[in-house]
């Protein structure tokens, strides 16, 4: 089968690989769509992403497709089913798993990180991690389920209430998803900070009340000018020290600051403890997607969440290397890989 194999920093090779074996509990999926994630970029750049990778490995953890075959112990799935996956497979036996925090599993299997993933024509996945797509969900939308599930976990930790004022920093795919989820959670005023005009325009179409150029405008002054009062929640979706510091600066009294964007492991931020104390800020973060996959699927299938407007292109495996290596390409939006192209 055709696959994109990661051999090390800046070394991704599109090559023929053996079709995966199907174990007793496995579902063999013919991959139709696999999203390119920021974690894939971190791995390609040699940084530590959300999981360790031991090359050679087929990357890709956001994918959907058609069931090709099932193992002898598999129940609930059959060839022809349209499915997507939750790529984070906990062991169920370690202390975190037994304590109900299995996203901190000590022996986590990660499809597309610790084992082969979806940047290939086929991937074999444990049945526990497979979900059927709704009738109204395309493969490209199904591939977006995992990032939506991650966003939901972050939203759950933000304490958003009806009437809340929320600022989202970053208008990439994650920021645009967060913005919509914030609206669904009941926030009445949602502001997006994003330097790229095209992304600000998409945000306004998706329901943002205000979109501010975060580089060329004085953000606090613009918020005041537009009558934005106390900011209850700030969700940082960029993963850069400067934007995390900005989030703390613009957060209002008793606000929650969600640090959602993935930084590099050695990066640091400068925080004035007195500012945190004076405003009674809650600084928090979220990690992957515990128990949120089903909710993500239902939001997408119901049409309550637009996961298509931020997609720049459905590309081929041969284009993946360029996408991972070129920030200008990624700035255009979300890329979905179709291994059959």
Predicted feature descriptions by range:
Residues 20-34, 48-95, 134-136:
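Glycine-rich beta-strand-centered segment in the early N-terminal region that forms part
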Residues 82, 165, 255-256, 282:
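Short glycine-centered segments of the SAM/dcSAM-binding site in methyltransferase folds
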Residues 91-169:
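NAD(P)H dinucleotide-binding glycine-rich loop of Rossmann-like/cofactor-binding domains
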Residues 137-216, 221:
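Mid-domain Rossmann-like dinucleotide-binding core that forms the NAD(H)/NADP(H) cofactor-binding site
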Residues 158, 205-280, 340:
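Glycine-rich cofactor phosphate-binding loops and adjacent beta1-alpha1 units
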Residues 195-196, 263, 289:
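Residues in the short beta-alpha loop(s) of Rossmann-like NAD(P)-binding domains
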Residues 245-249, 290-341:
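C-terminal hydrophobic helical "lid"/dimerization subdomain
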């Amino acid at each position: 089968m055709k696959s994109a194999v990661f051999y090390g920093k800046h070394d991704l090779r599109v090559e023929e690989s053996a079709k995966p074996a199907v174990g007793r509990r496995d579902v063999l999926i013919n991959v139709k769509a696999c999203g390119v994630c920021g974690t894939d970029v971190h791995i390609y750049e040699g940084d530590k992403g959300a999981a360790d990778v031991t090359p050679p490995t087929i990357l890709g953890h956001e994918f959907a497709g058609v069931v090709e075959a099932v193992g002898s112990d598999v129940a609930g799935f059959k060839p022809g089913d349209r499915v997507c996956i939750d790529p984070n497979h906990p062991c169920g036996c370690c202390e975190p798993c037994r304590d109900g925090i299995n996203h901190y599993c000590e022996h986590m299997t990660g499809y597309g990180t610790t084992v082969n993933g979806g940047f290939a024509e086929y991937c074999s996945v444990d049945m526990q991690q497979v979900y059927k797509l709704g009738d109204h969900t395309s493969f490209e939308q199904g591939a977006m389920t995992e990032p939506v599930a991650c966003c939901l976990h972050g939203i759950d930790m933000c304490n958003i209430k009806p009437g809340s004022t929320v600022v989202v920093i970053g208008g990439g795919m994650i920021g645009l998803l967060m913005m919509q989820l914030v609206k669904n959670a009941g926030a009445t005023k949602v502001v997006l900070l994003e330097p790229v005009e095209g992304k600000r325009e998409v945000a306004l179409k998706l329901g943002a009340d205000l979109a501010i150029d975060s580089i060329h405008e004085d953000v606090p002054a613009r918020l005041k000018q537009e009558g934005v009062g106390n900011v209850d929640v700030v969700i940082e979706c960029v993963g850069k020290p400067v934007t995390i510091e900005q989030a703390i600066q613009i957060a209002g009294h008793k606000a929650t600051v969600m640090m959602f964007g993935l930084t590099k492991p050695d990066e640091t931020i400068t925080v004035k403890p007195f500012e945190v104390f004076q405003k009674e800020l809650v600084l928090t973060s979220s990690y992957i997607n515990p128990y949120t996959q089903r909710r993500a699927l239902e939001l997408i299938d119901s049409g309550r969440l637009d996961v298509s407007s931020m997609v720049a292109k459905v590309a081929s495996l041969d284009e993946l290397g360029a996408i991972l290596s070129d920030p200008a390409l990624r700035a255009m939006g979300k890329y979905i890989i179709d291994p059959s192209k």
